[in-house]
């Protein structure tokens, strides 16, 4: 699919990929673009410190990630692992609870997370080099659009998610 009607506006892959490349060029110049590797090691350290499997720590982190800044996300996930509680919505707390008692297989955690963004975020945290998984969050949406996404635009159908993810895959 080369184009999509997104929230009433035509969006082409050409424009989306162009916007991704503009941001990527700026990031490459300013840093080494290793965010997921840094995050992978942070999750691994959290897991070791709290004597749990990395997959459980990554799954819990992913479960409580929606609408959360990264520093708060890590803190909430660790709080959840240590105390069984964190400040997030009931739905995401329940997902984190289910992850933490799941045994830690990727397939089971994937099914528990059951949402494009948090499933892909989990896989990116676990396997930073695997290009099959793309976390399309509000920041990624804004980059493709070339502007800050509205609250309405931050909610994606499965078809829209794949369109945005494909834009990133084709640039990578």
Name these PLM-found stretches.
Residues 1-172:
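HhH-family (HhH-GPD) DNA N-glycosylase catalytic core used in base-excision repair
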């Amino acid at each position: 699919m080369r184009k999509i009607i997104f929230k009433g506006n035509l969006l082409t892959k050409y424009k989306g990929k162009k916007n991704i490349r503009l941001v990527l060029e700026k990031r490459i110049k300013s840093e080494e673009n290793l965010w997921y590797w840094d995050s992978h090691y942070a999750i691994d350290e959290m897991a070791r410190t709290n004597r749990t499997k990395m997959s459980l720590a990554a799954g819990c982190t992913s479960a409580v990630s929606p609408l959360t800044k990264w520093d708060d996300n890590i803190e909430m996930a660790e709080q959840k692992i240590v105390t069984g509680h964190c400040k997030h919505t009931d739905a995401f707390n329940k997902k984190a609870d289910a992850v933490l008692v799941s045994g830690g297989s990727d397939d089971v955690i994937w099914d528990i997370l059951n949402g494009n963004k948090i499933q892909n975020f989990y896989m990116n945290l676990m396997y930073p080099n695997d290009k099959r998984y793309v976390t399309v969050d509000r920041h990624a949406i804004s980059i493709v659009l070339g502007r800050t996404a509205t609250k309405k635009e931050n909610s994606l159908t499965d078809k829209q998610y794949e369109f945005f993810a494909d834009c990133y895959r084709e640039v990578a």
